[in-house]
Every structure is written in structure tokens, then in C-alpha cells.
């Protein structure tokens, strides 16, 4: 066994992430510290394996389903690359060319696309109060389908950005910061400055800063958010009490 890989395995053996198995990933603040650290550790291990030409295939066959209800470049290609890295083929669902346009329900669509699927990645960030709820509706539908014997397995859902959080991007940013400063233990007190960015939808500019606030303050970092007046983020209740002290507001003129 490669010594570096063994080090990653030893680290994982010290973490409790058993509840993530066959689970879904909606929001980072729903995960424990051990679970977040396990994601970072596996990501580092996969990168090391890729760099050293060691196979990362977990699946011999299977599908990764992507559904983008908003435009995407980086996340779309990242999801496809990740599926390929693990041995899954990607099928992208175009709602405009599906029966959804003719009134097919979430339950019908979710179960249809889930045959032979191991993971579903969804981006739905356009409207406040809609995206995260839709993802939960999909999970409820495939869970019921599996329970009723329609599906032989329940695919895992990964949030590729909703109206509340952008967990994959925020964790990728966080891991880069961890590697830059030489470990999680070196992040406390570091300051992150973030500025509001224009988007045609209101939901997208909210989910990224909320995700950064929710994840980076968790590791003791100070987040400064600059935004126009009237564009304050609406922190989900679990974050309001525990993280607000590490957040500074700066209103742009």
C-alpha cells in the first residue's frame, strides 16, 4: 500500500461518517465536522491517485444523472468529470425535451431517470424557496420508489447549487484554502473578503455567500461580505446564532 494513501485511510478511520453512506448532500451545515473532514480527506486522496496514475474507479458501470435548471459551466463539467473519475457515465436531463414539459410529475420523472443511476446532481437556484425544496421532493420520490420496489436502489442526490447553498463550490474553495495554509488548524482568524456579484436571478447571489459563511466561519475564519444595500443574505436559522459573530457586513455605496 502506498504510504500516502495509507495515511489518508488512517485519517478516515478516525472519523465518524457512517451516516453519510447511501445518504444525500443538501447543505454543508447539515453535516458534522467529521463528515466534512471526511469529504476533504477523500478529495485529497482522489487527487493524489489521479496525479500518480492510480485508478480511482469505484463503479464498473452505472449512471450519474445531471439536471441543471440554470446555466452552468464549471459545475456542469466538474460533475461530469467526477462521475467519469469514479466510473459512471453521465446523462444530462434536458427538461425542455422531456415529458416534464407536458406535465409529467416530479415523482414520475425522478423514478424514470433513476433506473441504473447511482447519483443525481441538481442545480436549482433561480427562485428563493423553490430550489432546495425541489431537491427534497426528488429524494422523497426516489425513496418511495425504492421502498415500493420500483427502483432496485435509491440514488444519492448531490446539491449542485440551490437557493440556499452551493456546497460543492464552497467545499472546493475551502479545500484549496486548507491546502494553501497547511491544514485546518491554521485557518482560525484568517479573513475572507467576499463581494456581491450581479446575476439575473436573486437566488444565485445568495446561495454562494451563504454557503461560504456557513462553511468557513465553522473553521474559525472571519468572513467579510460586501453587498449593495437591500441585498442582505438571509442566514438559515442553524447558522444565525453560532456563526454570526464571525461575519462582518459591509454595505457598498
PLM feature segments, named:
Residues 57-178:
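Phosphate/diphosphate ligand-binding glycine-rich loop within oxidoreductases
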Residues 50-53, 106-108, 250-252:
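A generic local structural motif
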Residues 32, 125-133, 144, 197-209:
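Short, charged helix-to-loop "capping" segments that act as catalytic/coupling loops
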Amino acid at each position: 500500500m502506498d504510504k500516502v494513501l495509507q495515511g489518508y485511510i488512517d485519517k478516515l478511520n478516525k472519523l465518524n461518517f457512517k451516516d453519510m453512506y447511501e445518504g444525500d448532500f443538501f447543505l454543508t451545515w447539515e453535516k458534522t465536522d467529521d463528515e466534512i473532514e471526511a469529504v476533504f480527506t477523500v478529495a485529497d486522496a482522489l487527487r493524489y491517485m489521479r496525479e500518480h496514475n492510480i485508478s480511482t474507479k469505484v463503479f464498473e458501470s452505472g449512471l450519474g444523472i445531471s439536471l441543471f435548471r440554470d446555466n452552468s459551466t464549471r459545475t456542469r463539467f466538474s460533475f461530469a468529470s467526477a462521475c467519469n473519475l469514479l466510473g459512471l457515465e453521465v446523462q444530462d436531463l434536458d427538461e425542455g425535451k422531456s415529458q416534464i414539459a407536458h406535465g409529467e410529475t416530479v415523482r414520475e420523472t425522478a423514478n424514470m431517470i433513476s433506473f441504473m443511476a447511482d447519483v443525481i446532481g441538481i442545480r436549482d437556484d433561480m427562485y428563493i424557496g423553490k430550489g432546495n425544496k425541489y431537491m427534497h421532493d426528488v429524494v422523497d420520490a426516489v425513496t418511495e420508489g425504492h421502498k415500493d420496489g420500483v427502483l432496485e436502489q435509491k440514488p444519492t442526490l448531490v446539491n449542485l447549487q440551490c437557493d440556499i447553498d452551493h456546497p460543492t463550490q464552497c467545499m472546493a474553495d475551502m479545500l484549496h484554502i486548507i491546502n494553501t495554509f497547511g491544514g485546518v488548524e491554521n485557518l482560525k482568524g484568517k479573513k475572507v473578503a467576499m463581494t456581491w456579484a450581479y446575476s439575473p436571478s436573486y437566488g444565485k447571489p445568495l446561495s454562494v455567500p451563504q454557503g461560504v459563511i456557513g462553511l468557513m466561519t465553522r473553521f474559525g475564519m472571519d468572513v467579510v461580505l460586501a453587498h449593495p444595500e437591500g441585498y442582505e443574505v438571509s442566514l438559515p436559522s442553524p447558522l444565525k446564532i453560532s456563526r454570526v459573530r464571525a461575519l462582518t457586513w459591509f454595505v457598498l455605496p
